[in-house]
C-alpha cells in the first residue's frame, strides 16, 4: 500500500528516468538549428572533433548531447528520417547499459544508430547483435550510408566468413552480426595457434536487438564447438528396434504393486523414465541381441553407455515429434526452434539424441561429437564492459534481466498513442470447435477485405490450418520454418487488403508488417523505375494504406497461447504499429497443450457442467486467471532452469577463464622459458616427494623407484644410490638440491645442443598442444559429471555443492597432469633442428583442424558416450607396459 502511495507521489522509477532523459532531449533539440546550418563537410568533421575530445579526457556521457544531435542531422540528410524524441530517449537508455522496451514499429534499428555512433568514438568497437544472418546483413547495409557519411566504418559478421573477412569486420568501428557468430568467434579465438589468427578485439559495448529472444529464450542452451568422435551408428540402429516393443505406463506405480508399463513420460520436464519392468524387459532383449551377457544389468558401470543409448532412443520416439521439433529434409534431421519456428540448419542435439532421431526416421546416422569448447550466452555477454538491449517485450522478464545480467528495463513511450484493440480470449471445449471459430473470424475479415495474420505455435498447426483454409477456398500464404526463404516477400504482402497470412512464432520477427503493403518492396520489384514510376507507386500505396486503416488495420488471430506471455505479446505487437488501427484475438481450447498440462482440471469439468453447446465459447475471469497462472508456472520453471544452468556453468566459467587467460599469455609471450622453468620445478619436487617424503626417515625412501621414474619418464639418468654410498653426509634437503641441480643441468645441456631460440619455440608449441588436449579431455569429464550429478540428491547430498567440489578436484588434477606431461615431453624429445619444431606445430594444427560443428543446442539431453570402453587415466595402459595410461599412450607426443 505504502509502495503504491509513494509511486503516486513521486512517480515510478521508470517515470523518473524518462523525465530526467527528457531534459537531455530538450538540449539535443536546441542544437538542431545550429547543426542544420553546417555543410556536409563541417558535419562530418564533428566525428574527428569528438574523438580528439575523448582522448583529451571527456567522457562518452559528456559528448552525448552533441553526438546524438549530429547523428539526427546526418540521418535527415542521408535517409530523410529524423529521430523522434522517444528514439533519443531509447538511445540514452542503451548508452547507459540498460534494456529499452520499444513497441514494434517504433524504429529500433534507427534508435540503435545513436549509442552505436557515440560509443564508436572510443575506437574500442561496438557490436550490434541480431538473431539471424538476414537481419544482421539487412541492418548493416541499411545503416552503412549513415555511418560512412559520419566517417565511421561498418562491418558485418555472419556464418561462413573467412578469418581475414572476420578480422576486417571486427576492425570496423561498428560490427553487426548474430549472437551465435559472436559467441563462436570468442571460442574460436581461444583455439588459435598464433595471435595473428584472432578475430575479436576485447569486448567493449554490445547492443542486442530482440534481447529477450537472445538472453532469455536461447539462454538455456550453450554454444558448443565440437569435433567428430567415433562411429557407433550400428548400435543406434539396434536400440532403435527395441523401443517400439516397449509399453507406456499411464498411471504412477502404487506402493507394493508391480509396474504396469515399461516407461513413464513427464511432459512438463520433457523426460522419459524407465520402470523396473522396462529395465528387465530391455535387458532380456539385449541378452538375446548379445549386447548384454546373461545376468548383467543395464545399470552397471560397464553398461552405462548402453543405458544412455536406450534413454536417447526413448526420448527420440516418445518426446520428439516430426514437423513439431524437427523436419526431415534431404535425408537429414533439421531441428525446428521451439521459440521462433525457424529451422536451424547445421545444428544438432547433443549427447546422442540427434543420432537416435536419425535412427528413428531411417536417415543417415552421422557420427557423435566431442566437445572442444563451450560457453553459455549468459557468461559470454557478461564479458562485455557494457551491455544493452532492445525489444518490444521485456517487461514480463524484467526481474530475470536484472537478476542474471544486472540489466535494468526501461519502458519507452510510443511516439503515437496505441489504438490497437486487444479482444478478450475465447475458450472452447475442443480443438475442432476452436478451429471452426477461427475459420468464421477469418471469413469475416476476408468478406470485408481486412488483412489477417494467423499465429500458430508449431509447423504442424500452420499446415493443418492451411489445409483447413484451402477446403474453405480462402487464398492465403504460409510463413513457417519450411518456407522462410520467401519470408521477406510474404511479410511485405501481409498488410495488404484481403491478405491472409499464417505464421509460426517467428512471424517475420524483425520485419514490420506495413498496412497497405511494403512500399520499398513494391519499388524494388520495378524494372529501372523512373521518378514518375516511383511517384505513382507512392500515391497508390497511400490509397492502399488508408483503405486498410478504414477496414480496421491488421487483425491478429492466435490459435493458442504460448507457454510464455512474452511470446503472446510479441504476436500482438505485429499489429497496431506507430499508432495504426489493429485488433487481436486469442482462440483457445481445453485440448491445447498449455491448458492440458498446466490448467486446472476443475475448469474443464466446470465447462462441461455448464452444459455448453457445440461451438459455444466461454469468456470468464476465472479461466483467464487460470491461463495466466499456467503461463507464470512455466515461466517460473524456465527461469529456474536457466538459473540452474548458469550456476553450473559459473563453475566451468571460472575454469574457462583461467585456461583462456593462460593460453592467451602463452600466445602473446614470445619467450616462455620462465614459465616452463617454474613448471619443471613443481614437477621435479613432486616426483621427489613421491619417493622421498619430506621430513621422513631414510628407511622410507624409495631411491630405486625415483631413479626409474626419472629415467623412464624424464630421460634423466641419475645414480642417486651411488651418491648416497659415496657421501654419508647427504640428507633429505641436500639430496633434493643435488637432484634438482642435476635435473636442471640435463635440460641446460639440451638447450645448448639445439639452441635457445629453437627450444623456446618448441616449449611454446608443446605447451599449447598439451593445454588444448587436456582442456578438451576436461570438458568431456565435466560433461559426464554434470549429467550424473543429480543422482547425488538420493544420497542426501547437495548436487550443486558436489559438482563444485568434484569439478575443482578434476580441474586441479588436470592442471597437475598438464605439468607432468609438458615436462615429460620436453625432457624426452630429441630436437635436431627448427624443422622438428615446425613439424610439432603442424601436427597440432592438423589435429585441431578436424571438421567442427558449431552448435547452439539442448543442454539437457541424456548423456552419451562412445561405445568403446574408456581407459581411465590412472588405470594400467592397455599396451602392457605396466605404466599408468596417462603416463604412456594416454599422453600426446
From Swiss-Prot:
GO terms for biological process: intracellular protein transmembrane transport; protein import; protein targeting; protein transport by the Sec complex. It is a peripheral membrane protein. Its cofactor is Zn(2+). The lineage of its organism: Bacteria, Pseudomonadati, Pseudomonadota, Gammaproteobacteria, Alteromonadales. This is Protein translocase subunit SecA. GO terms for molecular function: ATP binding; metal ion binding; protein-exporting ATPase activity. The keyword Translocase applies. It is an enzyme of class 7 (translocase). Residues 840-893 are annotated as: Disordered. Residues 840-849 have a biased composition (Basic and acidic residues). May bind 1 zinc ion per subunit. Its main location: membrane. It holds the Pfam family SecA_PP_bind. Residues 855-868 have a biased composition (Polar residues). It comes from Colwellia psychrerythraea (strain 34H / ATCC BAA-681).
